[in-house]
């Protein structure tokens, strides 16, 4: 659900000027008195200018500069830190986005939009347990914060804590019966436990409530994938993309299905469509790199260089991105035949990736092969595709 939820956060950005200095909130739970001094008027002016610039895709650098200036003038202006965090995250700079959102949360711990944005960034960085911890603390203090609780379901599921995720999804449904998004999230929890029939029933309920729910159609696609029906999954993801053209998650999922099928050129089209909406989306850049690598078959130098450049951009913004590290290692080792240059990427991947990550065995094999004077040739394999997203971007 990343992209759909992130769009909500981005909308909040435009309204961020209404609560300066601990005033009344218009989003999330009611604000409490923060004890902060009144906001510096010049800082507020720069923040407003930054938010205005952020609405123009060509003015992102200007927006970042203005928001940084607002923070320099008034370090306690949490709204500016929140806005800057959202702009940086939308630009793919997740590490710096997390820094700003952590600072905003420290200044304004009662703000739901800040807690949600911080947790979403942590999810996108692969830190699902940290995201869940952030949200668990928040909903404990704010039981009625449904956006935070719904994202908590996703974070817990991503962290493999399906029982806790199911309990939280039911809490959402108690407070908001028949909520289409909560039903779709609950379906994903049951799918994660291997209960595909239950997941299918819940998806049907979600679509009965809202037949145009992009989230529900994406979950339907994942249920089809779990049943081995890639064609039906692709159709469901296509419906999701039709219902929400600005949500790149469905494009990413279609790309992943096409990668699995070896349809590299068509997969590349889907990732390029996602990048047309979100030019710096890391998952789309990594997916496009994998598609180009597959399409090149190790022979098209131009495609391989484009793939390398895409992965390099992701790692420049987030050096800890495990998917980019692994894919760069595979590109260097298998496509460019540079095992010595691949080895550091695989080693960094092994340092960063969770112990249960499915690509760890291959990374370990590559590291061991690079250590040998005459490593055994690797068996040919399709490029690793980004796993279909559960309905995030994001």
Segments (PLM) and residue ranges:
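Bacterial signal peptide processing site
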Residues: 21-24
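Terminal, low-structured helical/coil segments at or just beyond the last alpha-helical repeat
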Residues: 27-29, 294, 302, 322, ...
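Helix-start (N-cap) detector for alpha-helical repeat units in TPR-like alpha-solenoids
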Residues: 36, 42-44, 78-79, 112-113, ...
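Alpha-helical segment of the N-proximal tetratricopeptide repeat
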Residues: 39-73, 90, 188, 222
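Residue-level recognition of tetratricopeptide repeat
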Residues: 51, 86, 120, 154, ...
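Structural signature of tandem alpha-helical TPR/SEL1-like repeats
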Residues: 55-66, 90-103, 125-137, 159-171, ...
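Structural marker of alpha-solenoid helical repeat scaffolds
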Residues: 73, 107, 141-142, 175-176, ...
